[in-house]
């Protein structure tokens, strides 16, 4: 059996996936690169200060727009995950030792970058007794303490649905608690074998019950049907999800799940209208939308739709700005 780039042996599933060549993207999937002054300043700062964000390391297509708005995403808990999802670029393996200084370093990067809004996401750490709950919570707390004008969104694993571990994360009071369901029940176990669809919905419900703004994401093109997308949207809204993002699956490498279909822009328009009609407070949909795309602006819109005032320190998130270039209208 051949080896993966990280040196480990490829799984049988990965070998089977690799039999299908990487698909050619349709003409409507194009990045709109607008390198404004804020983006250029941040790019130079990140380079000279040797800072690290998911944005540049994952070559996110939305980096130009998000950085222009002083938003960025950070990965905590290491570069390897204890779980494997068939769409995810992060490799599976034994994670690095627990780094208790990481929250301070992330908060310092947020300060030096002058971010208006930071998204923090982490790998699953099933090897730890608390599955990384303290690390998630402490990173949010440290960013808030060191950067009072910065909003924080936590994009978390499910922590096995454990209420005590989730309560630790909730206690840090992020502006948004996000947990991505990603796909529909019929194909969920095949694509995300270490997660459970109903458990993920319950995690979102627990976030709602903690009086947090909640968020999730659906990736299309992994084998779902259009009807199943509608059913998943209804499930998420019933679970208490406030914000939903919907995107196209783009295959990270030949080892990953082949693309089942390319969703046309008009279908994203239809899905966005459907999600808004269901009652989601914030909806972004489009081939290149990602769950952290323009997250601060979407949070501000959702707070307004919920009838809540933004904290005075975060009022700037509602300032007029360019629209969501990568999302359908």
Swiss-Prot record:
Protein's name according to its UniProt entry: Lipoyl synthase
Cofactor (UniProt): [4Fe-4S] cluster
Gene name of the encoded protein: lipA
Subcellular location: Cytoplasm
Cofactor note: Binds 2 [4Fe-4S] clusters per subunit. One cluster is coordinated with 3 cysteines and an exchangeable S-adenosyl-L-methionine.
The UniProt record lists the keyword Iron-sulfur: yes
Pathway in which the depicted protein is active: Protein modification; protein lipoylation via endogenous pathway; protein N(6)-(lipoyl)lysine from octanoyl-[acyl-carrier-protein]: step 2/2
Cleaved signal peptide residues: none
Positions annotated to bind [4Fe-4S] cluster 2: 81, 85, 88
Domain annotation Radical SAM core: ranges: 67-281
Chemical reaction(s) catalysed: [[Fe-S] cluster scaffold protein carrying a second [4Fe-4S](2+) cluster] + N(6)-octanoyl-L-lysyl-[protein] + 2 oxidized [2Fe-2S]-[ferredoxin] + 2 S-adenosyl-L-methionine + 4 H(+) = [[Fe-S] cluster scaffold protein] + N(6)-[(R)-dihydrolipoyl]-L-lysyl-[protein] + 4 Fe(3+) + 2 hydrogen sulfide + 2 5'-deoxyadenosine + 2 L-methionine + 2 reduced [2Fe-2S]-[ferredoxin]
Similarity-based family: Belongs to the radical SAM superfamily. Lipoyl synthase family.
CDD domains, alphabetized: Radical_SAM
Pfam families hit by this protein: LIAS_N, Radical_SAM
């Amino acid at each position: 059996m051949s080896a993966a780039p990280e040196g480990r042996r490829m799984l049988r599933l990965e070998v089977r996936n690799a039999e299908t060549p990487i698909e050619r993207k349709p003409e409507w999937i194009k990045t709109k690169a607008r390198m404004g002054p804020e983006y250029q300043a941040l790019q130079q700062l990140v380079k000279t200060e040797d800072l690290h964000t998911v944005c540049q390391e994952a070559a996110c297509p939305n980096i130009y727009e998000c950085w222009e708005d002083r938003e960025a995403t950070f990965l905590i808990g290491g570069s390897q995950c204890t779980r494997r999802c068939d769409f995810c670029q992060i490799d599976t393996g034994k994670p690095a030792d627990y780094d208790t200084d990481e929250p301070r370093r992330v908060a310092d990067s947020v300060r030096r970058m002058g971010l208006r809004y930071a998204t923090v996401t982490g790998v699953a750490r099933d090897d730890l007794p608390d599955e990384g709950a303290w690390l998630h919570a402490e990173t949010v707390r440290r960013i808030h303490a060191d950067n009072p004008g910065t909003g924080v969104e936590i994009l978390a694993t499910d922590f096995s649905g454990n209420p005590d571990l989730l309560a630790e994360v909730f206690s840090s009071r992020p502006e948004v608690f996000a947990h991505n369901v990603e796909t529909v029940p019929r194909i969920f176990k095949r694509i995300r074998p270490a997660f459970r669809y109903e458990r993920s919905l319950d995690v979102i419900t627990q976030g709602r019950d903690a009086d947090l703004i909640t968020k999730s994401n659906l990736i299309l093109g992994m084998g779902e049907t259009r009807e199943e997308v509608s059913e998943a949207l209804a499930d998420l809204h019933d679970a208490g999800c406030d914000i939903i993002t919907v995107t196209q699956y783009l295959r990270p490498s030949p080892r990953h799940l082949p693309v089942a279909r390319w969703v046309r822009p008009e279908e994203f328009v239809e899905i966005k209208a459907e999600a808004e009609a269901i009652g989601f407070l914030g909806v972004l949909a489009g081939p290149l939308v990602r769950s952290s795309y323009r997250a601060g602006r979407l949070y501000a819109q959702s707070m307004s739709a919920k009838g809540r005032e933004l904290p005075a320190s975060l009022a700037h998130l509602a300032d007029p700005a360019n629209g969501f270039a990568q999302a359908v209208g």
